């Protein structure tokens, strides 16, 4: 092969290689264009589930799932479903109470950023249960916790966090400015009721899904107050009870019916010689049953039951097993107020089962210490003091406090009945202990028809804290 032939051959090979390279580049461009077109078309269609991109810089826990993080992770968000909580079922048959949650907030608060709180309560939607609480605008073991024994101040707010978690600035959601409160879920949204303002002119602010929907002005100008536990929702309507008037004499009591946070009906109870405060309410077969605190003159607890039209009945728990604190020793009951040692009181609850009643109460008859659940099979209608079952919750030597009811609807549990539950506040600090603050943790139990335990689940914090010394 002469020189010219070699030149022609090399040129031909280079031309062929160049053409192949050009074709590969064109193919690459076409491939990228097709891929981009497919992605663009996919983004133009509605997505089955929303996604959010979360970028982390270290290994961490997110929503109780361990994530090994070195780059961006795409997390699919669960769709939120809305239903109407019917509230038409009866209470589940139970034989005892299983522990459900314990937040240990005072123990954790000795070293962590934990709110100073009182009046915690629990309420459940069809998706979750949350702990609601009234903060003092202060943290434990901090100087602003000084003097938080005071009930009503402009710094108090209603907040909530997932049940069982210690309430802190990092896991809590603001709900309302309030020194008295209630909250409940109708299946579509959270209703919150927060009362704040001066004693002689307080206002209840109603919010639905965080938006103000209505207000209630104090009608007696004597410390308007509400349940300090969950309100009740049935078939899209929610119900609560409020009190206005003396804490040691005849006051005024009103039931309110609300839909999506707006008041559609209210009535005042005709209840002479009755005293209703801090009612613990629950749904049962389409009606509302409330068991309350008589701070005026009774050792037993008053109740009110009403339907969705607010037609009501009133009474006192007849049992000689008395539920208030302070109270008389168990003895002869009364279907009206038991007047012996009945002044003052504490928020509490009971669950009615026909003629029988589960009574939650402190173990002490004079101080807020200890807690027990007692089953009196005839206690709703009979006045004797016999009972058939007792379950220990808090030992007599440990502090308790307020207690109240909440329920889990069939839409949450998958059961065909409404599960009864209760919470107990474990108050620590002033006025019984040598601290500058008053706060509390909480435990909760739910009714089961299987084995349960007798024990004590106290707060357990070692006091005083550093700030107290």
UniProtKB/Swiss-Prot annotation:
Residues 28-469 are virion surface. Substrate binds at residues 118, 152, 277-278, 293, 368. Residues 91-469 are annotated as: Head of neuraminidase. It comes from the Viruses. Keywords: Calcium, Disulfide bond, Glycoprotein, Glycosidase, Host cell membrane, Host membrane, Hydrolase, Membrane, Metal-binding, Signal-anchor, Transmembrane, Transmembrane helix, Virion. GO terms for biological process: carbohydrate metabolic process; viral budding from plasma membrane. HAMAP family: INFV_NRAM (MF_04071). Belongs to the glycosyl hydrolase 34 family. Intact N-terminus is essential for virion morphogenesis. Possesses two apical sorting signals, one in the ectodomain, which is likely to be a glycan, and the other in the transmembrane domain. The transmembrane domain also plays a role in lipid raft association. Catalyzes the removal of terminal sialic acid residues from viral and cellular glycoconjugates. Cleaves off the terminal sialic acids on the glycosylated HA during virus budding to facilitate virus release. Additionally helps virus spread through the circulation by further removing sialic acids from the cell surface. These cleavages prevent self-aggregation and ensure the efficient spread of the progeny virus from cell to cell. Otherwise, infection would be limited to one round of replication. This is Neuraminidase. It comes from Influenza A virus (strain A/Swine/Wisconsin/1/1961 H1N1).
């Amino acid at each position: 092969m002469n020189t010219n032939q070699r030149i022609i051959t090399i040129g031909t090979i280079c031309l062929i290689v160049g053409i192949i390279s050009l074709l590969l580049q064109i193919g690459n461009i076409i491939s990228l264009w097709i891929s981009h077109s497919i992605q663009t078309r996919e983004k133009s269609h509605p997505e089955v589930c929303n996604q959010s991109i979360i970028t982390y810089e270290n290994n961490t826990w997110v929503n109780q799932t361990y994530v090994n993080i070195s780059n961006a992770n795409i997390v699919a968000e669960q769709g939120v479903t809305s239903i109407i909580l019917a509230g038409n079922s009866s209470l589940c048959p139970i034989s005892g109470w299983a522990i459900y949650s314990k937040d240990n907030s005072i123990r954790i608060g000795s070293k962590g950023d934990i709110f100073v709180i009182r009046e915690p309560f629990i309420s459940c939607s069809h998706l979750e249960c949350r702990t609601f609480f009234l903060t003092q605008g202060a943290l434990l073991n901090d100087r602003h916790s000084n003097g938080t024994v005071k009930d009503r101040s402009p710094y108090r707010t209603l907040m909530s966090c997932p049940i069982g978690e210690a309430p802190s600035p990092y896991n809590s959601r603001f709900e309302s400015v309030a020194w008295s409160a209630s909250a409940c879920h109708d299946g579509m949204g959270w209703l919150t009721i927060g009362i704040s303002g001066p004693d002689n002119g307080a206002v209840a602010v109603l919010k639905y899904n965080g938006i103000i929907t209505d207000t209630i002005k104090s009608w007696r100008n004597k410390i308007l107050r509400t349940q300090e536990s969950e309100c009740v929702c049935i078939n899209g309507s929610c119900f609560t009870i409020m009190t206005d008037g003396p804490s040691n004499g005849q006051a005024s009591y009103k039931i309110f019916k609300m839909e999506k946070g707006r008041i559609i009906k209210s009535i005042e109870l005709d209840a002479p010689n009755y005293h209703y405060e801090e009612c613990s309410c629950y749904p049962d077969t389409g009606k509302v049953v409330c068991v309350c605190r008589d701070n005026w003159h009774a050792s037993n607890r008053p109740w009110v039951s009403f339907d969705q039209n607010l037609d009501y009945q009133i009474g006192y728990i007849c049992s000689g097993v008395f539920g208030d604190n302070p109270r008389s020793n168990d003895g002869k009951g009364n279907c009206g107020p038991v007047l012996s040692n009945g002044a003052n009181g504490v928020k509490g609850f009971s669950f009615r089962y026909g003629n029988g009643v589960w009574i939650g109460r402190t173990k002490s008859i004079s101080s807020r210490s200890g807690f027990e659940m007692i089953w009196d099979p005839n206690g709703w209608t009979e006045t004797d003091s016999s009972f058939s079952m007792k379950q220990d919750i808090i030992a007599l030597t440990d502090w308790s406090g307020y207690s109240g009811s909440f329920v889990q609807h069939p839409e949450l549990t998958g059961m065909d009945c409404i599960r009864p539950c209760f919470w107990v506040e474990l108050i620590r600090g002033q006025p019984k202990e040598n601290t500058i603050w008053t706060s509390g943790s909480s435990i909760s139990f739910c009714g089961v028809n299987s084995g349960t335990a007798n024990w004590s689940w106290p707060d357990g914090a070692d006091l005083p804290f550093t700030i107290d010394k």
